[in-house]
C-alpha cells in the first residue's frame, strides 16, 4: 500500500495548505487523478512514471516509489519555481511529505518547465518502449521516431505558437539513450530539446517517454495521441507498412 502521511503534524510547518483544496482542478487533486488514469492505461505500472504541474511560482510533483493509483493529495511535493536542478540539496522544496522520497524525475520535469511547460508527464508505456527498439533496429542509435499521413498526428502541436500538425506533416520525436539513474537523463533530454526545439516529447530507449504541454489538458491529450501513434506504428511494422508515406 502507498505510504500514508499522517496529518497530525503541525500543518503550518510543512505548508500543508498548499495541497489542501476542494477545487478538482487544483494540481494536488489533479495529479492523483491523472496517475490513476495512467495506471489504468498501463503507463505507470509498478510505481514507475510520474507527473508534475506548474502553477505560477509553485511546482507540484508526484512522489517516488509510490503506487501511482493510490496517490493522495497529501503525498504531493511542492517546489518553489524557479529552482536549481542540481544539486538536489539546492532545490527549493516548500512542502515535503513525511517518509516519502522526491521523484527522480524532478530535474527532467524542471527542464520542461524552464521551457514554458505547464505540465509534464512521464510514462513507461510499452508502445513507447517498443518504437524506440524498432527505430534502433531500422535506423541505428541516432534515429528518431517519424510517422506521417495518420489522422491522430493532428493532436500534436507543430511548435510553440505554430498551431497543430496536419495529416500530411511528418511527426518527429527524438530518442535518447537510457541511463542507470533517472536524474542522469537530464543532460540528454535538454540536448534533444535544443536539437528539436518544436518537440513536445522525448522518447527514452528501453524506458518510456517524457511529454509536456502548455497546460494539463494539452500535456494529457498529447500523451494520449502519441501513445495511439506508437501502438499504431508497432502494428504497422508487423504488417510491413512504412511509417512515413
From Swiss-Prot:
Lyase found in the keyword field: yes
Gene3D superfamilies: Class II aldolase/adducin N-terminal domain
Binding site for Zn(2+): 122, 124, 207
Residues at which substrate binds: 105
EC number: 4.2.1.109
Cofactor binding summary note: Binds 1 zinc ion per subunit.
The keyword Amino-acid biosynthesis appears for this protein: yes
InterPro entries the record matches: Aldolase_II/adducin_N, Aldolase_II/adducin_N_sf, MethylthioRu-1-P_deHdtase_MtnB, Salvage_MtnB_euk
Keywords of this entry: Amino-acid biosynthesis, Cytoplasm, Lyase, Metal-binding, Methionine biosynthesis, Zinc
Chain residue ranges for the region called Disordered: 1-23
Localization, UniProt: Cytoplasm
Assigned GO CC terms: cytoplasm
Active-site residues from the entry: 151 (proton donor/acceptor)
Needed co-factor(s): Zn(2+)
Catalytic activity annotation: 5-(methylsulfanyl)-D-ribulose 1-phosphate = 5-methylsulfanyl-2,3-dioxopentyl phosphate + H2O
UniProt xrefs under SMART domains: Aldolase_II (SM01007)
Transmembrane segments annotated in the record for this chain: none
Gene Ontology MF, one: methylthioribulose 1-phosphate dehydratase activity
HAMAP family hit by this protein: Salvage_MtnB_euk (MF_03116)
Described purpose of this protein according to its UniProt entry: Catalyzes the dehydration of methylthioribulose-1-phosphate (MTRu-1-P) into 2,3-diketo-5-methylthiopentyl-1-phosphate (DK-MTP-1-P).
Entries under PANTHER family matching the protein: METHYLTHIORIBULOSE-1-PHOSPHATE DEHYDRATASE (PTHR10640:SF7)
Family label: Belongs to the aldolase class II family. MtnB subfamily.
Protein name: Methylthioribulose-1-phosphate dehydratase
Organism (species): Aspergillus clavatus (strain ATCC 1007 / CBS 513.65 / DSM 816 / NCTC 3887 / NRRL 1 / QM 1276 / 107)
Amino acid at each position: 500500500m502507498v505510504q500514508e502521511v499522517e496529518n497530525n503534524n503541525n500543518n503550518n510547518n510543512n505548508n500543508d495548505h498548499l495541497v489542501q483544496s476542494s477545487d478538482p482542478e487544483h494540481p494536488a487533486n489533479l495529479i492523483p487523478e491523472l496517475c490513476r488514469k495512467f495506471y489504468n492505461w498501463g503507463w505507470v505500472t509498478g510505481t514507475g512514471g510520474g507527473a508534475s504541474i506548474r502553477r505560477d511560482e509553485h511546482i507540484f510533483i508526484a512522489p517516488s516509489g509510490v503506487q501511482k493509483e493510490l496517490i493522495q493529495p497529501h503525498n504531493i511535493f511542492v517546489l518553489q519555481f524557479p529552482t536549481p536542478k542540481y544539486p538536489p540539496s539546492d532545490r527549493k522544496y516548500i512542502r515535503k511529505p513525511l517518509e516519502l522520497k522526491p521523484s527522480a524525475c524532478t530535474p527532467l520535469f524542471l527542464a520542461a518547465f524552464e521551457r514554458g511547460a505547464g505540465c509534464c508527464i512521464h510514462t513507461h508505456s510499452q508502445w513507447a518502449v517498443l518504437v524506440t527498439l524498432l527505430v534502433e533496429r531500422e535506423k541505428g542509435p541516432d534515429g528518431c521516431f517519424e510517422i506521417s499521413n495518420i489522422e491522430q498526428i493532428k493532436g500534436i502541436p507543430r511548435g510553440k505558437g505554430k498551431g497543430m500538425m496536419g495529416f500530411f506533416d511528418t511527426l518527429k520525436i527524438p530518442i535518447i539513450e537510457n541511463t542507470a539513474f533517472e536524474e542522469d537523463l537530464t543532460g540528454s533530454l535538454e540536448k534533444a530539446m535544443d536539437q528539436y526545439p518544436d518537440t513536445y516529447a522525448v522518447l527514452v530507449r528501453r524506458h518510456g517517454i517524457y511529454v509536456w504541454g502548455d497546460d494539463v489538458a494539452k500535456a494529457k491529450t498529447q500523451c494520449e495521441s502519441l501513445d495511439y501513434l506508437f501502438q499504431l506504428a508497432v502494428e504497422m511494422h508487423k504488417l510491413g507498412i512504412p511509417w512515413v508515406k
